[in-house]
């Protein structure tokens, strides 16, 4: 399975076109959008464009996505909202949590509350590809090169559940890949010049370590 992960499209035509080109160039089996797919208006237009790509698109809501993100996603045959659910593609389990950290950026939705984290732990296992919007605290979360703006709640969740991979965005200027224990964390924001991340899994040997790269 080839996964193409992006975040922070913000409904910008140029970034939608960048994703379209990425799908054409890399021929992924699934597109992951790790939040801020839309902006502060109706996400229908960007979802419509992504739906036309002809591959499954799994998505979570970020801080600039409207509260009706999940409802709008249901209108499109190729779009799946991952919020608080597990979804398998080619046998590989995905799970997601919508929302973002409350500080230092203002946002209309935060998922890092104790009860939500407890519920999320129930859908995350060691093979899970977890899709969230913010990075964990201290990992790929630097703003202006010095301020950590990630989530401490997510960091604790990763330590407790040890998912296989975390795909995130939110911090535009700190894209990359890093390990948190046994978990590979990828900040796949495309808000600057990047195309996101490509991750290749072995269908014949699902337990084999995936090959990931930024593009």
What are these regions (language model features)?
Residues 1-52, 123-125:
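N-terminal active-site segment of His-dependent metallophosphoesterases
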Residues 86-90, 155-161, 174-215:
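Binuclear metal-dependent phosphoesterase catalytic core
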Residues 10-15, 38-42, 63-70, 102-105, ...:
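Active-site environment of divalent metal-dependent phosphoester hydrolases
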Residues 58, 65-153:
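Conserved catalytic scaffold of divalent metal-dependent phosphoesterases
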Residues 20, 43-51, 69-73, 120-121, ...:
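Short amphipathic alpha-helical segments and helix-helix/interface helices
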Residues 50, 75-79, 148, 184, ...:
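Short, hinge-like loop/turn segments at secondary-structure boundaries
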Residues 5-8, 31-36, 57-63, 81-83, ...:
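Active-site neighborhood of phospho(di)ester-bond hydrolases with catalytic His/Asp-centered motifs
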Residues 1-10, 91-100, 129-133, 184-189, ...:
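Active-site-proximal beta-strand elements of phosphoester/diester hydrolases
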């Amino acid at each position: 399975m080839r996964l193409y992960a992006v975040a922070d499209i913000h409904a910008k035509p140029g970034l939608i076109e960048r994703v379209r080109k990425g799908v054409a160039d890399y021929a992924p089996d699934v597109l992951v959008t790790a939040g801020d797919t839309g902006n502060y208006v109706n996400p229908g237009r960007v979802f419509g464009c992504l739906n036309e790509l002809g591959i499954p698109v799994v998505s979570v809501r970020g801080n600039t996505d409207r509260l009706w993100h999940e409802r709008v996603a249901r209108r499109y045959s190729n779009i799946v909202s991952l919020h608080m659910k597990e979804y398998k593609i080619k046998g590989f389990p995905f799970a997601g949590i919508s929302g973002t950290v409350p500080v230092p950026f203002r946002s209309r939705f935060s998922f890092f509350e104790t009860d939500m984290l407890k519920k999320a732990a129930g859908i995350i296992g060691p093979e899970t590809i977890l899709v969230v919007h913010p990075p964990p605290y201290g990992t790929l979360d630097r703003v202006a090169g010095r301020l950590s703006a990630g989530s401490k709640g997510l960091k604790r969740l990763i330590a407790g559940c040890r998912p296989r991979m975390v795909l995130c965005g939110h911090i535009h200027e700190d894209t990359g890949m890093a390990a948190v224990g046994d978990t590979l964390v990828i900040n796949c924001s495309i808000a600057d010049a990047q195309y996101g991340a490509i991750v290749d899994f072995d269908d014949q040997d699902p337990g084999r370590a995936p090959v990931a790269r930024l593009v």
